[in-house]
Design a protein with these regions (language model features):
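Bacterial Sec-dependent N-terminal signal peptides
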Residues: 1-22
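A cross-family phosphate/adenosyl-ligand binding-site feature
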Residues: 23, 81-83, 92-94
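N-terminal phosphate-binding or glycine-rich loops at protein starts, especially the Walker A/P-loop
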Residues: 24-71
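Conserved acidic residues
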Residues: 45, 74, 124-125
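Short internal beta-strands
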Residues: 72-81
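Redox-cofactor binding/interface segments in oxidoreductases and associated redox assembly factors
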Residues: 78, 128-129
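Glycine-rich oxoanion-binding loops at beta->alpha junctions
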Residues: 89, 93-123, 135
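Glycine/threonine-rich flexible loop motifs
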Residues: 132-141
Length: 141
């Protein structure tokens, strides 16, 4: 009887592992892409992100939205470390232009820790893409 129970338990565990491997988790940017960015169409889009904002191929959300023909990405907002992760911990992030896209990058970790009305004046919708597992505190969450 003990042997039969052990075999049953092994079969159940193996079956669960096979099933778990078939499930694919999608990031928010992948869902938006699958929907052809329909909810962003016709809007001026601002993106709050950092280097964790990527799809399953590690492509930056900045680049994905910038390259999408029906998305009007007009500004980026960078928390600590900046939108591309090129600022050291604790250093102030300054407003600048993104070298890759030419878009304005507004700092959320410089003289202000939140977007000002001036930073938001040309934005219809904000997309927030910062991935985290939620077990630590950060200045940008």
């Amino acid at each position: 009887m003990k042997k039969i129970m052990t075999i049953c338990l092994i079969c159940i565990l193996c079956g669960s592992m096979v099933q778990a491997q078939k499930i694919r988790i999608k990031t928010g940017i992948e869902v938006l892409k699958e929907q052809n960015f329909k909810c962003l169409e016709g809007k001026r889009v601002g993106l709050i992100t950092n280097p964790t904002g990527v799809d399953n191929h590690m492509k930056s959300t900045i680049d994905i939205l910038h390259e999408a023909p029906n998305v009007n990405l007009v500004a980026l907002y960078g928390p600590e470390h900046g939108v591309r992760g090129d600022v050291h911990a604790g250093d102030h992030v300054t407003d600048m232009k993104d070298a890759s896209t030419g878009l304005p990058v507004y700092s959320l970790y410089g003289s202000t820790r939140k977007a000002t009305p001036e930073m938001l004046k040309d934005i219809d919708v904000l997309v927030y893409d910062i991935q985290d597992i939620g077990c630590r505190s950060f200045t940008y969450i």
